[in-house]
């Protein structure tokens, strides 16, 4: 809590550390998802400062999300904008354009085999997780997720399963790590995509498995 309000005091006016579209989207997602914890025991002035900062970040993202680099940074920016638009009073008009932009990014960045241009399995997992959050937030708000988002999740899930070793960790290619423990299982369960085997190569990678031994 102290770190959050220190950041608001130092950088909450839209300048300084953290004011890029991807980081702002990431911050909005975390602040909103952990709002009950962050606001616990705060006084009225602190609570108002928190919501003012959230609103300022939404306005910033509305203008600046197109400047985020294509791929994970842009998905972070748009997912944060959608989450904030759904959660904050008076921000509903921003949801539709953000959802449409997210659908366009899904169609452009996620190929027919469920891969992304960087071919980084851990980055693929991060994008997949953001899309599951966006889909869940829209569904819980009574909105129908765009078909492009749903289809992207359906393409990505088999690819992620194919890129996972028997110990649960992702193959480490193109700068990616094994992924946070339990993140892949949680994201797959949340997406609700029926388990299927990836047809052919998974993002250009082949998988062999026997018992507890895997080769990717």
Predicted feature residues:
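Carbohydrate-active enzyme catalytic cores, enriched for enzymes
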Residues: 111-216
């Amino acid at each position: 809590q102290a770190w959050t309000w220190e950041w608001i005091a130092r950088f909450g006016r839209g300048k300084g550390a953290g004011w890029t579209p991807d980081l702002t989207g990431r911050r909005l997602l975390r602040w909103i998802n952990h709002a009950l914890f962050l606001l616990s025991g705060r006084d009225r002035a602190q609570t108002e400062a928190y919501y003012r900062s959230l609103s300022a970040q939404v306005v910033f993202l509305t203008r600046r999300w197109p400047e985020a680099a294509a791929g994970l940074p842009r998905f972070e920016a748009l997912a944060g904008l959608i989450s904030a638009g759904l959660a904050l009073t008076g921000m509903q008009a921003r949801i539709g354009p953000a959802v449409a932009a997210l659908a366009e990014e899904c169609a452009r960045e996620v190929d027919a085999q469920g891969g992304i241009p960087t071919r980084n399995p851990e980055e693929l997992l991060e994008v997949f997780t953001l899309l599951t959050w966006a889909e869940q937030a829209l569904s819980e708000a009574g909105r129908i997720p765009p078909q492009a988002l749903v289809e992207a999740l359906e393409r990505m899930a088999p690819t992620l399963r194919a890129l996972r070793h028997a110990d649960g960790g992702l193959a480490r290619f193109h700068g990616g790590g094994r992924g946070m423990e339990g993140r892949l299982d949680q994201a797959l369960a949340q997406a609700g995509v029926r388990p299927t085997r990836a047809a052919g190569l998974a993002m250009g990678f082949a998988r062999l498995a026997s018992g507890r031994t895997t080769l990717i």
